[in-house]
Amino acid sequence: DELELLRLALGQLLEQLGVHHKLLLPNAHGDETEDAEAIEAVLASEAPPAYVERVTGLKLDAAVARRARRGLPDAPILCSDTTVALGRTIYGKPDDAAHAERMLGELAGHKHRVLTAVALQWGSKRLTALSVSRVTFSKLTPEQIAAYVATGEPLGKAGAYGIQGRAAAFIPQLSGSYSGIMGLPLYETAQLLRAVGFGV
């Protein structure tokens, strides 16, 4: 399952910082429904940084409410969201294989941004950070794109690719945060955790 692999990768990034964590997922107890598509919908004229920060804030709001409904003890809650942008065009998760092929075709041969917002709440204190990286894709043939999409790897990933997977073969250059491109920028996350008193 692609979503489980993503959660595992992000969990491994937190463990890299020495942070022990538990997942606070929707519907684990059947006590709520959340419309992820509605949360991740792009608003008219929304710039990529504003979009990813807004979505991360909404995810954090939902997680804080979820913890309260379940009567869980107060602890820091961390959320992140990643989007890919070419100019002002936002590339979220592809709807299907054909959509993934279109996205990759547009990104091929260009430099794009990967924006990951992180938000942390502990009690009434809420802190946020934004990581912006730049990734250059090589030119890709339609056959290369189709073969990559056929692996299933692009589905469920912003911009229809995972840098930690086979797409690394298409990336001659990047600048910024490798962990941020994966979905959780470790430097920014550590800064937020330190700001609320966690020694990382």
Feature-to-residue mapping (PLM):
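Alpha-helix boundary/capping motif
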Residues: 1-5
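GST superfamily/GST-like fold recognition
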Residues: 7-10, 100, 110, 132-200
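N-terminal polybasic phosphate/anion-binding patch
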Residues: 7-76, 89, 143, 150, ...
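Active-site-adjacent loop/tail segments of enzyme domains
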Residues: 51, 82-112, 139
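Residue-level signal for inorganic ion chemistry
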Residues: 56, 81, 100, 118, ...
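Anionic-ligand binding region
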Residues: 103-104, 117-121, 125, 132
